[in-house]
UniProtKB/Swiss-Prot annotation:
Cell compartment(s), UniProt: Secreted
GO cellular component terms listed in the entry, alphabetical order: extracellular region
Signal peptide: none
Modified residues (2,3-didehydrobutyrine): T48, T49
Propeptide: 1-34
Residue positions, PTM 2,3-didehydroalanine (Ser): S37
Keywords of this entry: Antibiotic, Antimicrobial, Bacteriocin, Lantibiotic, Secreted, Thioether bond
Changes after translation: Contains LL-lanthionine and DL-beta-methyllanthionine, when coepressed in E.coli with the flavecin synthetase FlvM2.
Protein name per its UniProtKB record: Lantibiotic Flvbeta.e
Molecular-function GO term, any one: signaling receptor binding
Residues in cross-link Lanthionine (Ser-Cys): S36-C40
Length: 72
């Protein structure tokens, strides 16, 4: 596998996989919209002991972080 290929099965073993609704709920508790101190370009969610970092380039925008600056 070269560096450009993405293997979802290997990713699932390494990362926490949560539903969009769960992400929205977690972010709604931590993000207050445009006035948030958390930059939506780097949303970090701690799930148990696994930290999942979503940075620019992701193709989803949780409703809790859908301010103008979060629409990539």
């Amino acid at each position: 596998m070269n560096n450009k290929e993405f293997n979802m099965e290997q990713f699932k073993k390494l990362a926490a996989v949560v539903s969009e609704d769960e992400l929205d709920e977690m972010l709604d508790e931590n993000v207050t919209g445009a006035a948030s101190s958390i930059p939506c370009a780097k949303v970090v969610v701690k799930v148990t002991t696994v930290v999942v970092a979503a940075t620019t380039g992701f193709d989803w925008c949780p409703t809790g972080a859908c301010t103008t600056s979060c629409r990539f």
